Amino acid sequence: MRTYAQLARLDRPIGNFLLLWPVLWALWIAAAGVPDLDLLVIFTLGVVVMRAAGCVINDFADRHIDGHVKRTRQRPFATGRVSEREALLLFVVLCLLAFGLVLLTNPLTILMSLVAVVLAATYPFTKRYTHLPQVHLGLAFGWAVPMVFAAQTGTVPVVAWLLLIATVLWATVYDTMYAMVDRDDDIKIGVKSTAVLFGDLDRLMIAILQGLMLLAMVQVGLHVEASTAYYLGLAGAAGLFAYQQYLIRRRERQDCFRAFLNNAWLGGVVFAGLAADLHL
């Protein structure tokens, strides 16, 4: 069981936070600060289950690669502790669990969940064919946003798509930082990423993406007529983005990873501003 837990990254909760924050942003906006408790539970559990499923299929896709990358060479596939059949079975079971949760919502959300499964299942293979797997990951992570609006309101309004765009931009930012950790190994074995694509322009491109993410969140705020508290949250996020730029200035592996981890705090700061705006 410990091996399966490691395969599903249950021992590394950072991914759950990165997935959960946009879901909470969406829930609070869609419900004007008072989301249905059952939907809060459904989507929180769904985040944990689908993130685990995504990690399993990612390791399956990278089973011939992870042994050649310093950061991943101790993963279950790389060390021979899990078989392909076991991983695929676990992926299917997790997807079925997630689908069972979605069945507790409404027809529109159920239909949209099919797209979520396709995005999660195909993401790990994109790094073989495009330098933009981080964008695909953003779509996979962010697709829960329109699903939340569908579940809470029965529709997917414009603000949901604005929030999805912001989430995709944010995911591209932090996953590019994550990819910078493995860039040297990825170049050697031919794995593609935005970190490889950007090269020496990586910090500049990350800064541009950070700015665009904040701009998208400003548009969300304007759309919902947010107050000062919301924009103070965005100001806090901007400060954390600046700190992340400081961390990655030398492009050292450990510092890039610290910058990646810092995004869990950033999502919380944005949520705090949003919640304060809706409740004060």
From Swiss-Prot:
This enzyme's EC code(s): 2.5.1.39
GO terms for cellular component: plasma membrane
Gene that this sequence comes from: ubiA
Topology relative to the membrane: Multi-pass membrane protein
Gene3D superfamilies (alphabetical): UbiA prenyltransferase
Compartment(s) where it occurs, according to its Swiss-Prot or TrEMBL record: Cell inner membrane
Cofactors named for this entry: Mg(2+)
Source organism of this protein record: Halorhodospira halophila (strain DSM 244 / SL1) (Ectothiorhodospira halophila (strain DSM 244 / SL1))
Protein name: 4-hydroxybenzoate octaprenyltransferase
